[in-house]
Amino acid sequence: MKKAVIVENKGCATCSIGAACLVDGPIPDFEIAGATGLFGLWG
């Protein structure tokens, strides 16, 4: 379900949001979901 939220933000927005979450890491679950979402888009 978290993947869907990330997929809604397409293009560079997804990269920016994913990178920001990975760098800041405010919420571990979202951080993992961000990485999974980015790999899902590219993979």
UniProtKB/Swiss-Prot annotation:
There is a cross-link at residues 21-30 (2-cysteinyl-L-phenylalanine (Cys-Phe)). Keywords: Antibiotic, Antimicrobial, Bacteriocin, D-amino acid, Secreted, Thioether bond. Changing residue 21 to A: In vitro no longer makes the second thioether cross-link, in vivo no cyclopeptide formed. InterPro entries: Subtilosin_A. Disulfide bonds: none annotated. Residues 1-8 form a propeptide. One of its GO terms (cellular component) is extracellular region. It comes from the Bacteria. There is a cross-link at residues 9-43 (Cyclopeptide (Asn-Gly)). This sactipeptide undergoes unique processing steps that include proteolytic cleavage after Glu-8, and covalent linkage of the alpha-amino of Asn-9 with the carboxyl of Gly-43 to form a cyclopeptide. Thioether cross-links are formed between cysteines and the alpha-carbons of other amino acids, Cys-12 to Phe-39, Cys-15 to Thr-36, and Cys-21 to Phe-30. In forming these cross-links, Thr-36 and Phe-39 are converted to D-amino acids. Propeptide cleavage and cyclopeptide formation only occur after all 3 thioether cross-links are formed. Changing residue 21 to S: In vivo forms 2 thioether cross-links, no cyclopeptide formed. There is a cross-link at residues 12-39 (2-cysteinyl-D-phenylalanine (Cys-Phe)). There is a cross-link at residues 15-36 (2-cysteinyl-D-allo-threonine (Cys-Thr)). It is found in: Secreted. Changing residue 12 to S: In vivo forms 2 thioether cross-links, no cyclopeptide formed. Coiled coil: none annotated. GO terms for biological process: defense response to bacterium; killing of cells of another organism. It holds the Pfam family Subtilosin_A. Induction: Transcription is highly induced by oxygen limitation and is under dual and independent control of Spo0A-AbrB and ResDE. Belongs to the bacteriocin class V family. Has bacteriocidal activity against some Gram-positive bacteria such as Listeria, some species of Bacillus and E.faecium. A single mutation (Thr-14-Ile) confers hemolytic activity against rabbit and human blood. This is Subtilosin-A. It comes from Bacillus subtilis (strain 168).
